C-alpha cells in the first residue's frame, strides 16, 4: 500500500500550516486581540505600536504593511490586531482567490475609510490583478474597463484611503514594483522557548487545561519556534493528560504525550529525521541538490524549502551552500554519528 506524501505531510503534528478548518476556528479563539496581548516579535510589535498610534492620531490610514516569514508565526494574527488597534474593519482574502481584476475591484470599492485589506499569500497574485493594485496603493484609484471590443472604455474610480496588509512565506517571489509599495516591511522570526512557554500558558488558560511551568516549557521547546505548533501540541497533550491522568499537564505528562506523538526533544518528527538522514547517510553529509533531496525523501521541493528547511537551518542542523545542502556537526551529533574532520567540501569544519 502506497502512502501519498502530500497527505502524509499535511498530517504532521508539527506542521506549521493549519490542518483543517476546525483547527483554524480553534486558532481564531486563541489569537491575541491586541498588541499588548501579543507575545514575542518584540521589535516588530514596538514598531507597529508607534506607527499605529501615529496614524490614529492623524486620523489617516496606516502605511501599507508587508509581513513575511515562515508559516505559523502570527502574520494573520498581526493583520487582525492592526485592524482592531486602528478601530477599522478588516477584509480578508488570499492571492490565489483573486483570479480576475474584477475580484479585486469589488473588494477595493467596498472598503470604508482607513479599512484594512489583508491578502494572504500575496506572492501568488496574478500579474493582471497586481497591475490593478498599483494605482490603488499609490493614489487610491483604480482603472476598470467597461464594455467590450471597440466600445470598451476605461473608467477611473476613486477609492477610500485604506491599508493593504500583505502576508507571504516567499518574500523573494514578490515583484519589485509590488514590494516597493509597502511602507512597512516586517520579517517575523522564530520564537524562543520562553516566549512559547508564555503562549502555551495563555492558551492552556483559555482551553481550561491546567498546566505547570515545566509542562508548558516541555511543550514549548519541542514546538519548533512556532506558536501554531505549540498550540496544536498543547491540545494533543491535553487529550493525553485527560485520558492517562487527571487532566493536569506536568513535565512528565507532556513528555509521555510527545513521545507518543513521535516528537523528539528538539521538535523533530519523522519527516525531519528522514530529511537529515538522507543528507547524512544517502549523500554522505552533502552537498546535495534540492531536486535530488526531494526525490530521495519523496517530497516536493517547495515543501522542503518552505516547511522543512527553515527550522533545520535556523537550529544549525542544515546548511545551504552554492553547491547544495550539507549536514552540520550538530546534525551528526544529534544522530550519534561521528562528524568527519573536514566538511563535505573538503574544508575543515569551522574554517573559512
UniProtKB/Swiss-Prot annotation:
Annotated disulfide bonds: none
Record: residues binding DNA: 301, 320, 325
Keywords, sorted A to Z: ATP-binding, Cytoplasm, DNA damage, DNA recombination, DNA repair, DNA-binding, Hydrolase, Nucleotide-binding
A Gene Ontology biological process term: DNA recombination
Cellular compartments annotated: Cytoplasm
Region of interest called Head domain (RuvB-H), as start-end residue ranges on this chain: 265-352
GO molecular function, one term: four-way junction helicase activity
Gene3D superfamilies: 1.10.8.60, P-loop containing nucleotide triphosphate hydrolases, Winged helix-like DNA-binding domain superfamily/Winged helix DNA-binding domain
Pfam name, any one: RuvB_N
Assembly behavior: Homohexamer. Forms an RuvA(8)-RuvB(12)-Holliday junction (HJ) complex. HJ DNA is sandwiched between 2 RuvA tetramers; dsDNA enters through RuvA and exits via RuvB. An RuvB hexamer assembles on each DNA strand where it exits the tetramer. Each RuvB hexamer is contacted by two RuvA subunits (via domain III) on 2 adjacent RuvB subunits; this complex drives branch migration. In the full resolvosome a probable DNA-RuvA(4)-RuvB(12)-RuvC(2) complex forms which resolves the HJ.
Entry-linked HAMAP family: DNA_HJ_migration_RuvB
The protein, known as: Holliday junction branch migration complex subunit RuvB
Species, as recorded: Herminiimonas arsenicoxydans
Amino acid at each position: 500500500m502506497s502512502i501519498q506524501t502530500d497527505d502524509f505531510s499535511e498530517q504532521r503534528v508539527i506542521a506549521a500550516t493549519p490542518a483543517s478548518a476546525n483547527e483554524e476556528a480553534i486558532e481564531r479563539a486563541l489569537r491575541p486581540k491586541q498588541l499588548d496581548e501579543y507575545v514575542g516579535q518584540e521589535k516588530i510589535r514596538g514598531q507597529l505600536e508607534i506607527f499605529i498610534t501615529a496614524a490614529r492620531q492623524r486620523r489617516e490610514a496606516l502605511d501599507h504593511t508587508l509581513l513575511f516569514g515562515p508559516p505559523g508565526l502570527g502574520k494573520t494574527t498581526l493583520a487582525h490586531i492592526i485592524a482592531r488597534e486602528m478601530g477599522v474593519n478588516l477584509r480578508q482574502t488570499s492571492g490565489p482567490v483573486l483570479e480576475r481584476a474584477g475580484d479585486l475591484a469589488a473588494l477595493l470599492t467596498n472598503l470604508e475609510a482607513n479599512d484594512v485589506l489583508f491578502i494572504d499569500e500575496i506572492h501568488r497574485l496574478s500579474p493582471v490583478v497586481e497591475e490593478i493594485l498599483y494605482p490603488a496603493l499609490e493614489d487610491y484609484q483604480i482603472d476598470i474597463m467597461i464594455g467590450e471590443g471597440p466600445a470598451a472604455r476605461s473608467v477611473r474610480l476613486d477609492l477610500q484611503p485604506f491599508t493593504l496588509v500583505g502576508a507571504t512565506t516567499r518574500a523573494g517571489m514578490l515583484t519589485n514594483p509590488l514590494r516597493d509599495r509597502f511602507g512597512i516591511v516586517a520579517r517575523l522570526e522564530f520564537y524562543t522557548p520562553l516566549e512559547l512557554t508564555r503562549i502555551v500558558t495563555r492558551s492552556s488558560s483559555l482551553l481550561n487545561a491546567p498546566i505547570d511551568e515545566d509542562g508548558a516549557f516541555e511543550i514549548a521547546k519541542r514546538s519548533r519556534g512556532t506558536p501554531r505548533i505549540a498550540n496544536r501540541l498543547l491540545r494533543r497533550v491535553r487529550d493525553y493528560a485527560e485520558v492517562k491522568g487527571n487532566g493536569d499537564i506536568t513535565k512528565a505528562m507532556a513528555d509521555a504525550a510527545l513521545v507518543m506523538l513521535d516528537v523528539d526533544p528538539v521538535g523533530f518528527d519523522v519527516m525531519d529525521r528522514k530529511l537529515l538522514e538522507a543528507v547524512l547517510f544517502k549523500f554522505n553529509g552533502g552537498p546535495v541538490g534540492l531536486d535530488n533531496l526531494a526525490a530521495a525523501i519523496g517530497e516536493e521541493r517547495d515543501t522542503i524549502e518552505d516547511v522543512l528547511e527553515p527550522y533545520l537551518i535556523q537550529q544549525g542542523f542544515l546548511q545551504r551552500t552554492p553547491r547544495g545542502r550539507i549536514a552540520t556537526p550538530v546534525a551528526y551529533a544529534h544522530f550519534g554519528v561521528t562528524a568527519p574532520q573536514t566538511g563535505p567540501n573538503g574544508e575543515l569544519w569551522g574554517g573559512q
